[in-house]
Amino acid sequence: MASRVNDQSQASRNGLKGKVLTLDTMNPCVRRVEYAVRGPIVQRALELEQELRQGVKKPFTEVIRANIGDAQAMGQRPITFFRQVLALCVYPNLLSSPDFPEDAKRRAERILQACGGHSLGAYSISSGIQPIREDVAQYIERRDGGIPADPNNIFLSTGASDAIVTMLKLLVSGEGRARTGVLIPIPQYPLYSAALAELDAVQVDYYLDEERAWALDIAELRRALCQARDRCCPRVLCVINPGNPTGQVQTRECIEAVIRFAFKEGLFLMADEVYQDNVYAEGSQFHSFKKVLMEMGPPYSTQQELASFHSVSKGYMGECGFRGGYVEVVNMDAEVQKQMGKLMSVRLCPPVPGQALMDMVVSPPTPSEPSFKQFQAERQEVLAELAAKAKLTEQVFNEAPGIRCNPVQGAMYSFPQVQLPLKAVQRAQELGLAPDMFFCLCLLEETGICVVPGSGFGQQEGTYHFRMTILPPMEKLRLLLEKLSHFHAKFTHEYS
């Protein structure tokens, strides 16, 4: 810091104007933000790709991006019906073309009728296009066995991430020991730790139980809450189901216990359910927090506050780039809900193409429509392939000495634990790196495989992990798993 001040003083003496915005004058909360999924490992992967394009010789011919859940970047084909409707919405002159099915045309016409100037390029209202919010409400009702959903409690968003951050902005307040504490699962999706750092909230970690397939334990929630009350005011409990990066699917009994705990302790519940279509393990089933809450009856159904989130980026869709999502709020204070609408209006509106895509996700072709057969086949193919990849990943890792992988019950990732030799840990410390960061960097440099170290998600002290997506095409995934297992054996031998 002193050197930067001296540099500015020297600039002043030389007649040069110093920068107004520096690392010292910028928002300190932003400096604390970290996002491992796009952190140093990924930056190095980009450099390696550039070097390969320039003809630099490497021990590999391509960088395999297994660091992020971007399905289409990994080769997954878009759902035909979704793209047909989007094409019609973007260029309505195609509505007269015989190359598009009639149900796609009807869907596009309905969306365009709800847009300002009948154009996807117009702003929508801040909470999202009304007929699309109505379709989201009907989807939630179907998903939850007829439990009513009110479109006025649904806000469309720029992906689920935007809605999550907006909700946290509403919830975070106070200073000192009165600062809002937010309970998040460890391992966690780094969006949460990054958002809490930016908002200057207190992150309260509760650990998932790796020995029980990343189970959520109420006793652990209670421990985290009690310890946090000495330093903050815990007000929020976040649950990711299915889990990211851990891939577990919560049982109904667990969800009921979490709701009872939140109600008893006066916590606002945030349920991140963007992987609700991604459930693979036999015996596992997705249960929405909204459905369980309502079926529990009063006082839970009438008093427990809940926000649940969904997205077009995951599931079988994989439409990450369109940035479509929604949040449904339950039992929210009416005046606070108005403030939420105000906060969203500052950003004008979510991307309208993303809203249109969300409409197709929640209102896909029905059995009586011409596009249904192809849509259903494409959807089932994607989910069946993901299930096979999840099983393969678990099997290969568990056959490799020094690697242990829990069942990938859902979502799009495996989060295996790796044993690292003491000499490797010591070498990492000499370099100022977390041991699993050192392992992942070495893996990238030697094999071109880009994964994210577990330290970026949080983990029990003394354990090491990495997160790897299961999205690559099957043959590439087999090769990736084989190369990774061989590298770990070589790495272990080298540092033993």
Curated annotation (Swiss-Prot):
Q: Which GO terms describe its molecular function?
A: L-alanine:2-oxoglutarate aminotransferase activity; pyridoxal phosphate binding
InterPro entries for the chain: ALAT1/2-like, Aminotransferase_I/II_large, PyrdxlP-dep_Trfase, PyrdxlP-dep_Trfase_major, PyrdxlP-dep_Trfase_small
Annotated localization: Cytoplasm
| Disulfide bridge partners, by residue number | none
One family name in Pfam for this protein: Aminotran_1_2
Question: Which catalysed reactions does the entry list for this protein?
Answer: L-alanine + 2-oxoglutarate = pyruvate + L-glutamate
Please tell me which top-level EC class this enzyme sits in.
Answer: transferase
Which residues in this protein are found as N-acetylalanine? A2
Q: What is its EC number?
A: 2.6.1.2
Designated name of the protein = Alanine aminotransferase 1
Q: Which organism is it from?
A: Rattus norvegicus
The taxonomic lineage of its organism, from the top, reads: Eukaryota, Metazoa, Chordata, Craniata, Vertebrata
